[in-house]
From Swiss-Prot:
One of its GO terms (biological process) is ergosterol biosynthetic process. The keyword Nucleus does not apply. Keywords: FAD, Flavoprotein, Membrane, Mitochondrion, Mitochondrion outer membrane, NAD, Oxidoreductase, Transmembrane, Transmembrane helix. This is NADH-cytochrome b5 reductase 2. Disulfide bonds: none annotated. Its main location: mitochondrion. The keyword Magnesium does not apply. Pfam families: FAD_binding_6, NAD_binding_1. The chain crosses the membrane at residues 28-50. It comes from Phaeosphaeria nodorum (strain SN15 / ATCC MYA-4574 / FGSC 10173) (Glume blotch fungus). Belongs to the flavoprotein pyridine nucleotide cytochrome reductase family. It is a single-pass membrane protein. The gene is MCR1.
Amino acid sequence: MFARQVIRPARQLQQHVRRYASEAPQSGGSSNGALYVGIGAAGLAGAYIYMRGGKPAAPLSEEANKVAAKVGGASKKAFTGGDQGFISLLLDKSEVVNHNTKKLTFKLPEPDMESGLPVTSAVITKYKGPEMEKPVIRPYTPVSDVDQQGTVDFIVKKYEKGPMSSHMHNMEPGQRLDIKGPIPKYPWSPNKHEHIALIAGGTGITPMWQTARAIFKNPEDKTKVTLVFGNISEEDILLKKEWEHLENTYPQRFRAFYVLDNPPESWQGGKGFITKELLKTVLPEPKEGEKVKIFVCGPPGMYKAISGGKKSPSDQGELDGYLKELGYSKDQVYKF
């Protein structure tokens, strides 16, 4: 079975990992313990702080407007971009995910509406407290399906000095938040690539979930997906049950590798950094060209090590870090 064999030489392990197994992994356990023992991931020095920028909302493209038409006509879209501006959404539910993260569900203006947010897109949130001179504006990526009706969901991690995340964590059902979108990111379409890799840290997982969910929900999309997800502790692994469900349901097309800075004693996954050695072992090879796409999303330190940072919200900047050293081209990598 994929990455569940006894430790083997690096070359054999690399060949083994790049094949997707024909049998499902056992539920409730790590499928990658032997892999991490074999590659010996290095230690991680401290937590990351995640902050992303966004560019102004733009009118939806023709591709983006093809969101799930229903019998009797196309669905209504809450976010249309362009000159729409911010819309005020009512918080319907606030659920605790872990010690510093909540899932917030906002009602769309009409119960039969869909968000209108294309796969990989984000929104801008705005809040001005009573003692603030200027409003706080932050981007967030929804985790709900693009065709979900009536509501839109966000996973929000609270940061000690984060005014928007703190405000959203303090919100009670019935309160409202100004939201604008979409902010287009990578223009995804089914089967655009044969194999994609999602390299994420912390709440950088949200656009990765949105992308993976769209792939596996579409029976016509046969894309293979590899997830490499770094966190501080096991409880910080967001959407872990959902990722495990995908791994058990699509064992030939999806694999997840988790790396923890502060793992429990029983942890069989990776420990410390997401290393160059791990990426070399589990990612699709760069020689595959356009068939392969690598997505990166996480805190600044992770970008610096793995891909180099973005020059601006609208400029991907040059490729650097481990991915460049491993032979990937700039066109094969997208930084959220």
